[in-house]
């Protein structure tokens, strides 16, 4: 007579769940909980009820519309400038090496580690009203007023952001350009292809993933940049981060500040979603 022993159920392994629980607790504490407080404060009206009263108040404000347009304009032109300048400099450093090119590459890497206010401080010393350039021009040509005054305008903010964020385009782009097979470039040159055609048909397709990655990062950072605009003190240039600061710190209107911050978060997520959509359409892995 044979005995049929019941199969023992394997013991439930809780270790993977514990490893998953720890990062979830960290995210909930450092991200989701503060975000939920911002959302609650933004949606709570003056009467204490949850609604869209503050949202309608913010959207109808001309100051908010101007800040939104300024934010998008600065982000677009700064990102375009970073892509253009970063592409040109990367092509030169990778394909046209010259004495000192390695040093320049290391300086570019160092720029990433520098705080943004340090770059704007250097801009103030060079292009400011009492800076080196204006001081030299006023002493040479006897100008009564500083002839160079673009720094305290939107153009100055865009130029400063291009200087700060261009290395974020150059680092992945230079790494991608170094992976291109040099034999393809030599074959194209032997066949008489124009350098612009070589760039468009050989180099650009290989560099597209790096360009999109660097460009999307620049777009997100310039959209949320606060220190450069604040430190330069550009006249009439109000952005969404600056408006959050002024509403919360200067006016103590925390409800409106939280609503603008929430809109800024949605804007950033929307821009990132557009990047992911464009990356999937072009076959770029992100």
Swiss-Prot record:
Indicate where this protein resides in the cell.
Cell inner membrane
**What membrane topology is annotated for this entry?**
Multi-pass membrane protein
Domain (ABC transmembrane type-1): residue spans on this chain: 68-275
Q: What induces it?
A: Induced when inorganic phosphate is limiting; this is controlled by PhoB.
Which CDD domains does this UniProt record tie to the protein? Answer: TM_PBP2
| Keywords assigned by UniProt, alphabetized | Cell inner membrane, Cell membrane, Membrane, Transmembrane, Transmembrane helix, Transport
Task: Show the Gene3D superfamilies listed in the entry.
Answer: MetI-like
Transmembrane spans: 19-39, 76-96, 111-131, 150-170, 202-222, 254-274
One short Pfam name that applies is BPD_transp_1
Please, one GO biological process term? 2-aminoethylphosphonate transport
User: What cellular component GO annotations does this protein have?
Assistant: plasma membrane
> What's this protein's function?
Probably part of the PhnSTUV complex (TC 3.A.1.11.5) involved in 2-aminoethylphosphonate import. Probably responsible for the translocation of the substrate across the membrane.
Spell out the family assignment given in the record's similarity comment: Belongs to the binding-protein-dependent transport system permease family.
Note from the entry: Maps to a phosphate-starvation-inducible locus previously known as PsiC.
Q: Protein name, please?
A: Putative 2-aminoethylphosphonate transport system permease protein PhnU
Organism annotation = Salmonella typhimurium (strain LT2 / SGSC1412 / ATCC 700720)
């Amino acid at each position: 007579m044979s005995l049929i022993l019941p199969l023992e159920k394997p013991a439930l392994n809780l270790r993977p769940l514990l490893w998953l629980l720890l990062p979830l607790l960290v995210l909930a504490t450092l991200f989701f909980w503060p975000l939920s407080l911002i959302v609650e404060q933004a949606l709570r009206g003056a009467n204490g009820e949850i609604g869209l009263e503050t949202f309608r108040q913010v959207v109808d404000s001309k100051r908010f519309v101007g800040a939104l347009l300024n934010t998008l304009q600065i982000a677009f032109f700064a990102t375009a400038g970073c892509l253009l300048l970063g592409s040109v400099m990367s092509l030169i450093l990778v394909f046209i090496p010259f004495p000192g090119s390695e040093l320049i590459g290391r300086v570019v890497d160092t720029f990433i580690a520098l705080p943004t206010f340090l770059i704007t401080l250097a801009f103030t010393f060079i292009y400011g009203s009492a800076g080196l350039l204006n001081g030299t021009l006023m002493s040479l040509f006897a100008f009564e007023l500083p002839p160079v005054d673009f720094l305290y305008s939107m153009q100055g903010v865009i130029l400063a952001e291009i200087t700060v964020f261009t290395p974020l385009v150059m680092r992945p782009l230079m790494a991608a350009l170094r992976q291109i097979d040099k034999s393809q470039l030599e074959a194209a040159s032997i066949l008489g292809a124009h350098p612009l055609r070589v760039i468009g048909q050989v180099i650009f397709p290989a560099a597209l993933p790096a360009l999109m990655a660097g460009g999307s990062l620049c777009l997100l950072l310039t959209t949320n940049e606060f220190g450069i605009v604040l430190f330069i003190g550009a006249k009439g240039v109000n952005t969404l981060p600056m408006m959050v600061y002024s509403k919360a710190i200067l006016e103590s209107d925390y409800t409106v500040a939280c609503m603008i911050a929430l809109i800024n978060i949605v804007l950033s997520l929307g821009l990132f979603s557009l990047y992911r959509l464009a990356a999937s359409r072009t076959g770029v892995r992100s």
